[in-house]
Amino acid sequence: MAETTSWIPVWFPLMVLGCFGLNWLVRKVNVWLYESSLGENRHYLPPGDLGWPFIGNMLSFLRAFKTSDPDSFTRTLIKRYGPKGIYKAHMFGNPSIIVTTSDTCRRVLTDDDAFKPGWPTSTMELIGRKSFVGISFEEHKRLRRLTAAPVNGHEALSTYIPYIEENVITVLDKWTKMGEFEFLTHLRKLTFRIIMYIFLSSESENVMDALEREYTALNYGVRAMAVNIPGFAYHRALKARKTLVAAFQSIVTERRNQRKQNILSNKKDMLDNLLNVKDEDGKTLDDEEIIDVLLMYLNAGHESSGHTIMWATVFLQEHPEVLQRAKAEQEMILKSRPEGQKGLSLKETRKMEFLSQVVDETLRVITFSLTAFREAKTDVEMNGYLIPKGWKVLTWFRDVHIDPEVFPDPRKFDPARWDNGFVPKAGAFLPFGAGSHLCPGNDLAKLEISIFLHHFLLKYQVKRSNPECPVMYLPHTRPTDNCLARISYQ
């Protein structure tokens, strides 16, 4: 029997070595681009990996967030480099530092001497260079000062309650007659209707539906790779922004013309306030500033509220003991209402202590905002590591909100953990950010959520069609079926 001889071509080992060598060279490109210029200081960078040229670590980020375990992205960093709480990476087109602990996140968000807003250029192209995400610290303070009171002020919130409540009551009754429907989709329409009325006095269903569709496309592009080629989410998002800007420009131009002709409405909305406001030097906002503020507020003002309402409602229905406690609180508010008072008052919403715990726990569990972006204004030392000037810093809220040392059994929905005035340590609960860049519409958002849950708890129940439906995490945490469900009376 002839002896069988196995052989390997002489070029095969060379090809394998060549592949490994090429891989090593390619993986070093970002190191040469961003670390070499630091000289000896590069040795003080946090542990981590800058990934591939151009795409950096985005593939592993997107891969993790398209699974049922998005936290595997940072867990891999911790497993590979240890629980440092600070890691280098290349994210959204920039050399970056990811911080994952309450202490590091708090410092980054509150130290305005060391850090400034650092949103990626791709995000600013979508949200607007004159919005809160794209302007300097001084401009941010000015714009926030001019717009805060009309959004979050006591008088403004009291004025919004009747309109919010009227719409909530109407849609809840309507939904009981619709059979099966996408709960999240209709919640977003509700919250968009409310924010459109507050800002623009608009109640046109056609206009609202068209704009809301554009916002959906816009949001899918914010967390996507910045590939401006047809077929990619970012390209669709840029087209959506152009449509939104054109629509808002038309509205602003029409309102300015009405004011020139002295055609004034008895009702003042947010656009009127934006057209009227002047800073201490008498400077007003130009059209670009107004449009970017409108685009940002209308987006944040309906996306976060709609998603939070959906998850809070679902969590309440899944936890009967929590639901009963929250319902009892709302019934007590009704019993304590002064005779002759119709509808909720701001004072009553601030008595909803347990419901506020439900909302906070929902915000903690779902972590609506994945991260905030900052940029180092100078070389910064943190935890013994260097954050180089000009590098982006990402505060990773998901890790902060599931820290078991602060929140025992962190994956569990448990509003009772907030009992007895429990306040997490500074930086451990950041649903609206922190510091001077705290979300400017947070009080309005919580008011909307509380009013909806008040009426839902008193009369309604929700039954999901697919309770085991998979969850997607980009751009925001939601069921893939948009929470297909039925609403009925209790």
UniProtKB/Swiss-Prot annotation:
Membrane in keyword set: yes
Location in or out of the cell: Endoplasmic reticulum membrane
Binding site for heme: 439
Topological type in the membrane: Single-pass membrane protein
Cofactor: heme
Tissue: Widely expressed. Highly expressed in influorescence stem, influorescence, and silique tissue. Weakly expressed in cauline and rosette leaves. Expressed at a higher level in stem and influorescence than AtKAO2/CYP88A4.
Catalytic activity: ent-kaur-16-en-19-oate + 3 reduced [NADPH--hemoprotein reductase] + 3 O2 = gibberellin A12 + 3 oxidized [NADPH--hemoprotein reductase] + 4 H2O + 4 H(+); ent-kaur-16-en-19-oate + reduced [NADPH--hemoprotein reductase] + O2 = ent-7alpha-hydroxykaur-16-en-19-oate + oxidized [NADPH--hemoprotein reductase] + H2O + H(+); ent-7alpha-hydroxykaur-16-en-19-oate + reduced [NADPH--hemoprotein reductase] + O2 = gibberellin A12 aldehyde + oxidized [NADPH--hemoprotein reductase] + 2 H2O + H(+); gibberellin A12 aldehyde + reduced [NADPH--hemoprotein reductase] + O2 = gibberellin A12 + oxidized [NADPH--hemoprotein reductase] + H2O + 2 H(+)
Keyword Endoplasmic reticulum attached: yes
Stretches that traverse the bilayer: 6-26
PROSITE patterns found in the cross-reference section: CYTOCHROME_P450 (PS00086)
Molecular functions per Gene Ontology: ent-kaurenoic acid monooxygenase activity; heme binding; iron ion binding
Alphabetically ordered keywords of this record: Endoplasmic reticulum, Heme, Iron, Membrane, Metal-binding, Monooxygenase, Oxidoreductase, Transmembrane, Transmembrane helix
EC number(s) given by UniProt: 1.14.14.107
Pathway(s) of this molecule: Plant hormone biosynthesis; gibberellin biosynthesis
Described purpose of this protein according to its UniProt entry: Catalyzes three successive oxidations of ent-kaurenoic acid giving gibberellin 12 (GA12), a key step in gibberellins (GAs) biosynthesis. GAs, which are involved many processes, including stem elongation, play a central role in plant development.
The protein's name in its UniProt record: Ent-kaurenoic acid oxidase 1
